[in-house]
Amino acid sequence: LLMVPVMTLRAATAVTWVLLAAQLLGVLALSWSGLVLAFVVFCTPLGRVPVGALGARVIRGRIEAGVYPRGGAVHVRLWAAERWLAASGATNISAAWLVKPLARMLGARIGRGVDFQTLPPVTGLLTVGSGAAIEPGVDLSGHWLDGDELHVGAVTIGDDARIGARSTLMPGTEIRQDAHVEAGSTV
């Protein structure tokens, strides 16, 4: 039942493309303003990012650092928020300049001059200091399953710190100012 809204959102992109094609071929006589609006919201990063982030934030609700039961309310909300974000297309953005706004929309605190090249956590429990650099493929999810427990924690990255590509920052990680985490590391 939780997947019905997610699949509806996913289908909205295809339906928009079909309606646009039908309009261009003269099969339908629809409002151009409505089609352009649907195209911007469902088919471009300018619409997908806010729809995905704000929807995920509403589904997720308030999540605090802690240990929760697997399959419990927090786990299901977190899972559903991740599915919503993926279905919106926000996780497939190739526009790197939209990654920081996506992170902020999810609740992360991002400082000035941050070089952010990876997807932010849906938990919103991320703080990145000014001038920090996060290279591609860094896992900032801030949660993991261990048996029957879901561990959720904040990830904090200090000013001018650098996180190498494909590194994993576990829940509760704090990277201090000017620190350098080598590529492929787990902290």
For every predicted segment, state its role.
Residues 103-105, 109-187:
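Structural signal for interior beta-strand "rungs" in well-ordered beta-sheet cores
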Residues 1-107:
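Terminal amphipathic alpha-helical/low-complexity segments used for targeting or macromolecular assembly
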